[in-house]
C-alpha cells in the first residue's frame, strides 16, 4: 500500500509538471523545482534498490548555525533539521549484527539521489547497512537548507550525527564495525570525520577528495 501511494504521488507530480504552460514552468524557482525532483527521486529509490533493501528516510537534528542570521530571534540557537537515508539489506538476521557504512554524498549544494543506486546495491549485496545524510546545504529541501551550508564545518557534524543515530537506535548495527566513504566533497567529509573522530570509524575511503579547504576557498 505504501509503495502504491508513493507511485500515485509520483504520477501526480509528473502530470502536474508536464501540464504546466512553458511560461509557468519557467517561473518556478530553482528551489521549488529541486524540491519537486527530490520527491520524484525519493520514489525511484524503491524502484532502484527496493528488491534487495529496506529503504527509509529520517529527520535528524544537527548543531545550530555557526552564525545566526538574527541572533535575537526566538529561533536563534535552535538545532537544524536534516534528512538521512537508511538502507538495510532484506537478508539481515535480526539476531545478528552487521557493519555500517556512512556515505556522505559528493558535490557542494548537491544531494543523495539515485545516481548512487549502483553503489548502494553493491554495498547491500555485501550485507552492509548504509546511512547517507543530506547534510546542511543539500539541495531538494528549499532555500532554508540550501542557505545553511557550512562548507568544511558543521556539515561534518551532521554526517557524524547520522552515524551515531544508526549505532544508538538499531540493534543490528555493529558499533565496532563502522566505516565511512565518499567521493569529492563527500571525500572531504570522510577525511574530516576520520580526523575529528578517529576512534569512531574502523576504516574510511576518500575518493578524489578536497584535501586543502583553505586553497579551495581561496
Regions found by a protein language model. Give the residues of each.
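N-terminal targeting or regulatory segments adjacent to alpha/beta-hydrolase or S9 domains
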Residues: 1-5, 9-61
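Acidic-histidine catalytic/liganding microenvironments
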Residues: 5, 169-170, 197-198
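Short beta-alpha junctions and helix-cap segments that line functional grooves
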Residues: 42-46, 70-71, 115-119, 190-193
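Cap/lid segment of the alpha/beta-hydrolase catalytic domain
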Residues: 52-83, 87-176, 181-183
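Residues within well-formed alpha-helices
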Residues: 83, 103, 189-192, 203
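Hydrolase active-site cap/lid region
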Residues: 142, 191-218
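Gly/Ala-rich beta-loop-alpha elbow adjacent to hydrolase catalytic centers
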Residues: 182-186, 190
Amino acid at each position: 500500500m505504501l509503495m502504491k501511494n508513493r507511485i500515485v504521488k509520483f504520477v501526480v507530480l509528473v502530470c502536474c509538471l508536464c501540464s504546466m504552460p512553458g511560461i509557468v514552468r519557467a517561473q518556478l524557482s530553482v528551489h521549488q523545482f529541486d524540491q519537486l525532483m527530490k520527491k520524484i527521486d525519493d520514489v525511484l529509490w524503491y524502484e532502484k534498490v527496493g528488491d534487495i533493501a529496506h529503504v527509509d528516510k529520517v529527520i535528524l537534528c544537527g548543531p545550530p548555525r555557526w552564525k545566526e542570521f538574527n541572533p535575537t530571534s526566538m529561533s536563534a540557537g535552535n538545532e537544524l533539521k536534516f534528512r538521512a537515508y537508511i538502507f538495510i539489506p532484506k537478508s539481515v538476521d535480526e539476531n545478528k549484527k552487521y557493519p555500517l557504512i556512512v556515505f556522505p554524498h559528493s558535490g557542494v549544494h548537491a544531494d543523495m539521489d539515485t545516481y548512487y543506486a549502483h553503489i548502494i546495491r553493491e554495498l547491500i549485496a555485501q550485507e552492509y547497512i548504509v546511512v547517507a545524510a543530506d547534510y546542511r546545504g543539500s539541495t531538494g529541501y528549499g532555500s532554508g537548507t540550501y542557505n545553511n551550508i557550512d562548507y568544511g564545518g558543521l556539515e561534518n557534524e551532521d554526517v557524524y550525527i547520522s552515524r551515531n543515530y544508526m549505532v544508538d537506535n538499531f540493534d543490528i548495527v555493529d558499533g565496532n564495525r563502522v566505516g565511512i566513504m565518499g567521493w569529492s566533497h563527500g571525500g572531504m567529509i570522510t577525511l574530516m570525520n576520520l580526523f575529528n573522530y578517529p576512534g569512531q570509524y574502523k576504516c574510511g575511503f576518500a575518493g578524489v577528495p578536497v584535501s586543502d579547504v583553505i586553497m579551495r576557498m581561496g
